[in-house]
Amino acid sequence: MYSETPIKRRPSSRIYVGKVPIGDGAPIAVQSMTNTKTTDVEATIAQIRALEKVGADIVRVSVPTMDAAEAFKIIKQSVNVPLVADIHFDYRIALKVAEYGVDCLRINPGNIGNEQRIRSVVECARDNNIPIRIGVNGGSLEKDLMDKYREPTPQALLESAMRHVDILDRLNFDQFKVSVKASDVFLAVESYRLLAKQIRQPLHLGITEAGGLRAGSVKSAVGLGMLLAEGIGDTIRISLAADPIEEIKVGFDILKSLRIRSRGINFIACPSCSRQEFDVINTVNELERRLEDLVTPMDVSIIGCVVNGPGEALVSHIGLTGGANKSGYYDDGVRQKERFDNLNLVDSLEAKIRAKASLMANRIAISDKTD
């Protein structure tokens, strides 16, 4: 596999959300947000655990009321993944969840209130060693900025962010990250580009309110892909009107596509045509479903014929090339004598992939111990 990655990460400072490092070259963290009622403690805990199972590094939880803050206390005690409390309007809620061990506070400059309220949040965060995210959003800019610019613009989002960066600077508080999200790809991208030139703090990327699963994934991949390819971004959240688990999957797929961070299998599969010797589409779909639990990074090529199959297999950890009745099997680019019956491909491939993943995981573990 071609291994060169031309991406040079933007230099930034580092903060920690719980034990997860953000910025200064740390792996780009993948986040999601619960969509349960936070006061439904049982449902919220279940969703957080499900997100952690599919690889979420950090989970954000909306805390809109003091009742939700009390629920957050129980939730925080029941999960392992770091939690960010999403705070709007009432700064006192931030002070309350800080008592309960929150790992990060997200505040929205457009509605959190005056500088004195921000000062109270910052002092509380400092006392409890909690980082802050300044979360600017094109849909909730301050009224004076909307009056000035008439609509959300990159300059408006930047000005909103810098106002609050300046406040934190005056308070000598540097444990924060910043986001300037918008639902329009170009608005978000240009806003982040401007911000990246102004500060050294880590940047949290996202296209807000991106849409449903398909359209939202595409929009997020385009917008975040542009920024990540330029080295901008230290943590990401894919905002989808879908199951939050899908946000984590799409997030890792974007990072995987740019070879920034890999988790699980990278499937290389042909779209299929008249030359296919087996049902490529159903084979890939079934393997993706069965192998979701694997976390070891590996490339698996599944090609329906011999036109591109051998070439892709040469640069894959596991490769399958379609043949009449039986298909060729490659291991680390080497064609094996063993061939797979086309009627039983999924079971055969699953066994080989799991065995390979186990072997590779052991090698990684040994290498880590040696280092």
UniProtKB/Swiss-Prot annotation:
**Which EC numbers does the record give?**
1.17.7.3
Q: List GO BP terms, alphabetically.
A: isopentenyl diphosphate biosynthetic process, methylerythritol 4-phosphate pathway; terpenoid biosynthetic process
**Gene3D superfamilies associated with the record:** Dihydropteroate synthase-like, Sulfite Reductase Hemoprotein, domain 1
User: Which molecular function GO terms apply here?
Assistant: 4 iron, 4 sulfur cluster binding; 4-hydroxy-3-methylbut-2-en-1-yl diphosphate synthase activity (ferredoxin); 4-hydroxy-3-methylbut-2-enyl-diphosphate synthase activity (flavodoxin); iron ion binding
Q: In which pathway does it act?
A: Isoprenoid biosynthesis; isopentenyl diphosphate biosynthesis via DXP pathway; isopentenyl diphosphate from 1-deoxy-D-xylulose 5-phosphate: step 5/6
List the InterPro entries.
Dihydropteroate_synth-like_sf (IPR011005), IspG_bac (IPR016425), IspG_bac-typ (IPR004588), NO2/SO3_Rdtase_4Fe4S_sf (IPR045854)
Report any Pfam family annotated for this entry.
GcpE
Per its record, the protein catalyses: (2E)-4-hydroxy-3-methylbut-2-enyl diphosphate + oxidized [flavodoxin] + H2O + 2 H(+) = 2-C-methyl-D-erythritol 2,4-cyclic diphosphate + reduced [flavodoxin]
Q: How is the cofactor bound?
A: Binds 1 [4Fe-4S] cluster.
- Residues annotated as binding [4Fe-4S] cluster are C270, C273, C305, E312
According to its UniProt record, which protein family does this protein belong to?
Belongs to the IspG family.
Against PANTHER family, the record matches this protein to: 4-HYDROXY-3-METHYLBUT-2-EN-1-YL DIPHOSPHATE SYNTHASE, 4-HYDROXY-3-METHYLBUT-2-EN-1-YL DIPHOSPHATE SYNTHASE (FERREDOXIN), CHLOROPLASTIC
Instruction: Explain the purpose of this protein.
Output: Converts 2C-methyl-D-erythritol 2,4-cyclodiphosphate (ME-2,4cPP) into 1-hydroxy-2-methyl-2-(E)-butenyl 4-diphosphate.
Name listed for the protein in its UniProt record:
4-hydroxy-3-methylbut-2-en-1-yl diphosphate synthase (flavodoxin)
Taxonomy of origin reads:
Bacteria, Pseudomonadati, Pseudomonadota, Gammaproteobacteria, Alteromonadales
Q: Which gene encodes it?
A: ispG
